[in-house]
Amino acid sequence: MKKPVSSILAAALFVAAAPAFAGIHYKSSTKTEDARGHSSEVQVEGWVAGEKAKVEFKESTNPSPATQKGTYLLTKDAGKTLYLVNPEEKTYAVWDLNAMLGAVGSIMNGMGPVLRIQFSEPKVEKVADEDGGTVAGQPAHHTKYRTTYTTTVKVFGMGRSNDVVSEQDFWTTTRLPDAGLGVWLRAQPPRTGNADFDRLLTTERYKIQGYPLKMVTVTTSTDPKSGKSSTSRNTMEVTQLDTSAAVPAASFEIPAGYKEAQLLPTKEGSRD
């Protein structure tokens, strides 16, 4: 009987001695329904301590391989340098969303007369600015914006326009100071490098204070000629939040032996 007891005691002492940060642990769900009624959901679990953050994809019906179950994002500097880690393949890769979307923007800019996508100057209205009750146990402030603009797609000079109305609700909190939260809980999308589209991303609605604990975006696009419209909906919500969690320091380390992969051209390397 002594051996099991001593083994349990040794394990307990090991756990107690392992370095840990006083940090934040949360769970979040993002649900998307497109104009055709197709839906997807991504559930994540996050650990944050100051500028350090780990965001693991727990469940996903999104077809992107980056969000497959078990894959996670890792940073030590609030997302300035971000890694996508794949435990199944034992690989890690620099995750630079701005660079990826910038490549898309370059393609949009380079299509010239073949394909041109234009966005009119957006009109932004603040339609709500009030107490938002509590979300995941945190006091929240609710703001709502209505943004209207026109998109025009031209192929070889022939164009079609749509009038777009985007209504976006934010429930934000300023009670959480940890910068690592911004890796996942962010209101402002990354830039694409396309001037017209990026103008939409710098509107007043993204100049909110604190971190969003819940966001709901409903976008309706209407063809002015036919009158037909389509609507998409996106909802992100933090469902659980512990602000005094013990977060193991090892949570923010890439495991030894993982090899570097490439999402975009980068220098080769590995962690032995």
What are these regions (language model features)?
Residues 21-272:
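Extended soluble regions of mature proteins
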Residues 1-9:
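Bacterial N-terminal signal peptides that target proteins for export
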